[in-house]
UniProtKB/Swiss-Prot annotation:
PANTHER family: GLUTAMATE-1-SEMIALDEHYDE 2,1-AMINOMUTASE, GLUTAMATE-1-SEMIALDEHYDE 2,1-AMINOMUTASE 1, CHLOROPLASTIC-RELATED. Belongs to the class-III pyridoxal-phosphate-dependent aminotransferase family. HemL subfamily. NCBIfam families: hemL (TIGR00713), PRK00062.1 (NF000818). It comes from Synechocystis sp. (strain ATCC 27184 / PCC 6803 / Kazusa). This is Glutamate-1-semialdehyde 2,1-aminomutase. Its cofactor is pyridoxal 5'-phosphate. Homodimer. Its EC number is 5.4.3.8.
Amino acid sequence: MVNATPFITTKSEEIFAAAQHLMPGGVSSPVRAFKSVGGQPIVFDRVEGAQIWDVDGNQYIDYVGTWGPAICGHAHPDVISALKQALDKGTSFGAPCAQENVLAEMVIDAVPSIEMVRFVNSGTEACMSVLRLMRAFTGREKIIKFEGCYHGHADMFLVKAGSGVATLGLPDSPGVPSNTTKATLTAPYNDLEAVKALFVENPDSIAGVILEPVVGNAGFILPDAGFLEGLRELTKEYGALLVFDEVMTGFRVSYGGAQARFGITPDLTTLGKVIGGGLPVGAYGGREEIMAMVAPAGPMYQAGTLSGNPLAMTAGIKTLEILQKPGSYEYLDKITKRLVDGLLAAAQDAGHEVCGGSISAMFGIFFAPGPVRNYEDAKLADTNKFARFHRGMLERGIYLAPSQYEAGFPSLAHTQEQIDQTIAVAKEVFATL
């Protein structure tokens, strides 16, 4: 066990109780409230490497990684050092900074689809902007998204969405005008025939298809062989754009993202998480002729006070430099596969039906026999059993995402010893379920 002392969360309970009078649900993002797993949310105090400490002094091995950005580990000394130097020059300029050029060149060099890039402040903002760009470039209004894929909380995307919407069991969200979502068409993930049928019904009105190339917001779901290739062919056939939401997969499943890993080049890509090194960031980019539509070069307006923030750019640059070191992704592949194989074996030995998988530093397990190919399959998972598993792991010093419907994220800071320790704890917890 990571925690050698009794699991006490008195301070977390006090802080969370006060927070509920100050913020809706006591949190700044819904999944943090532990609604789907029950129990007391943990209030963090500090992070380092693969470990986190809460305000009560409990220590955990972390597999959330701030929901993806901490691929090099928390508070990496090189990132912290670079940020301290940048901080001495100021926190925000609201004007061009040299760091934007450096990070932009790194992104363009790495991601096959990106010839030009625009920095924003979050993945949601990137997806909102790329939605407008899709429609501006094509002159069409409708889009296709996939059930369970999450692209932020913009109105047009809150249709059969994943992430917190899946966690809370919400079909959509109040406050979204019905007219807004009429132009959003949905299909099951991994179902090319359903996508083709939508194009046949709407041959001249679909601006594009947007998806997570590897789903991480309905749990972890890989694309079937030929699925991404089929989408590329269909979008070309009907004159629509293909958009990969790589906010989660970008620079995580490979240095060039899922598109480099699978060899499929979309027209546009959204990024976030890793490229900010733990600071708020987002980006969207693609072919130069499409990006030329974006103001001030073109007529499609999009702006942001803190976009291209020098601190976020600095953290992103240093993070990508670390990831460029030889062997980084081979190591991430190795430890993540070791983790998932160990978890699945532990579950099977204890008599539980669990399935799962991984790709580089991204993984997931479902409390279901599987296979899980889409959102409907994911919803068959035993969320009550997952909640008990989550609590058992938490009390023994392992911090997993507090939802069955979220992927997990190991980092370069995780050691094989920590992976093996996690598997040993899981064996203990599975035996109690």
